[in-house]
């Protein structure tokens, strides 16, 4: 055995330049592959974290049919039992009850259609960091009677902090919802699409406006171990009413999943090409070493 090791060692260094070149090629390929894949997976993790923390949550509790219809007819009652069951689960870090709809936002002669979100100010800030996006005015409290409005939407409506707007939409069971709200704060999103939309108010005000009593439309959920996403989803699904459903972020954001899959496939192809090129180089070295011995 020692003879073979000694023979192999002498054979490697028989042509130092060629051996160093082959070793360097392999090292370069592995190093480049590690860097490239690390950057890719880091980007994927950032995309997922941004998506779930900015809006959807890792999981989201809804009534069946709400995701497809976004109607108050598919809202559900937030009971104390349901709230405690979610709040006290060891695998859940944050639950964020919401009321989500779209309505007409009007000021003077300007009118826009915008998402209107009823939130718990503390839970929303804990999950999405909404308070740090405040550019003017004050953040909402549980006692607030006003609203927060996205900066781009405020510019389109030509409004500022202290101005009043009218929100007009359809409430629960077809009730007409219309009310005047004062702007308490303006928020700024880095994403233009989000910065040109979104109006936030407290859940209490949204329930009064849309005649929802104690009903909500969704509960985004943040968890402490994303690797157990489906395990936790299945566990929670077995403990909730059959009229409710828990969706994963992948189901709510299929475009992110598709983008990651395409980018991952392209990265794998690039690695394959790299390994083939390096493989031919190593194969050439082996052939030359063999020919020298014949």
Predicted segment positions?
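Hydrophobic, regular-secondary-structure patches
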Residues: 37-115, 136-143, 238
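Hydrophobic secondary-structure segments that place a key small or acidic residue at a functional site
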Residues: 99, 112-119, 133-204
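Small-residue-enriched segments and motifs
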Residues: 90-93, 114, 181-185, 244, ...
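Short, membrane-interfacial amphipathic segments enriched in basic
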Residues: 1-6, 246
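Mechanotransmission and gating elements of multispan inner-membrane complexes involved in transport
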Residues: 171-267
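Solvent-exposed, non-transmembrane alpha-helical starts
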Residues: 70-77, 106-108, 113, 124-129, ...
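Hydrophobic alpha-helical transmembrane segments of multi-pass inner-membrane transport and secretion
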Residues: 16-43, 261-294
């Amino acid at each position: 055995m020692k003879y073979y090791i000694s023979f192999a060692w002498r054979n490697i260094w028989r042509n130092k330049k060629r051996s160093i070149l082959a070793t360097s090629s392999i090292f370069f390929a592995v190093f480049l592959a590690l860097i490239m894949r690390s950057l890719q997976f880091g980007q994927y993790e950032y995309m997922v974290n941004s998506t779930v923390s900015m809006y959807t949550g890792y999981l989201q509790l809804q009534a069946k049919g709400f995701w497809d219809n976004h109607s108050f007819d598919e809202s559900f009652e937030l009971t104390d039992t349901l709230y405690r069951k979610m709040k006290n689960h060891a695998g859940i870090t944050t639950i964020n009850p919401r009321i989500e709809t779209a309505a007409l936002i009007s000021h003077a002669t300007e009118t826009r259609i915008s998402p209107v979100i009823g939130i718990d100010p503390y839970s929303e800030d804990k999950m999405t960091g909404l308070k740090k996006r405040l550019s003017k005015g004050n953040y909402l409290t549980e006692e607030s009677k006003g609203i927060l409005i996205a900066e781009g939407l405020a510019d389109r409506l030509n409004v500022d902090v202290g101005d009043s707007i009218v929100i007009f939409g359809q409430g629960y069971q077809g009730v007409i919802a219309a009310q005047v709200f004062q702007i308490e704060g303006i928020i700024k999103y880095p994403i233009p699409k989000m910065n040109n939309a979104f109006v936030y108010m407290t859940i209490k005000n949204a329930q009064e406006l849309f005649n929802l009593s104690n009903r909500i439309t969704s509960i985004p959920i943040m968890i402490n171990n994303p690797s157990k996403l489906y395990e936790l989803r299945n566990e929670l699904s077995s403990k909730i009413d059959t009229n409710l459903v828990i969706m994963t972020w992948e189901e709510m954001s299929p475009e992110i999943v598709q983008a990651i899959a395409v980018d991952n496939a392209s990265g794998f192809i690039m690695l394959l090409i790299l390994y083939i090129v390096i493989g031919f180089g190593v194969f050439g070295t082996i052939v030359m070493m063999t020919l020298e011995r014949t």
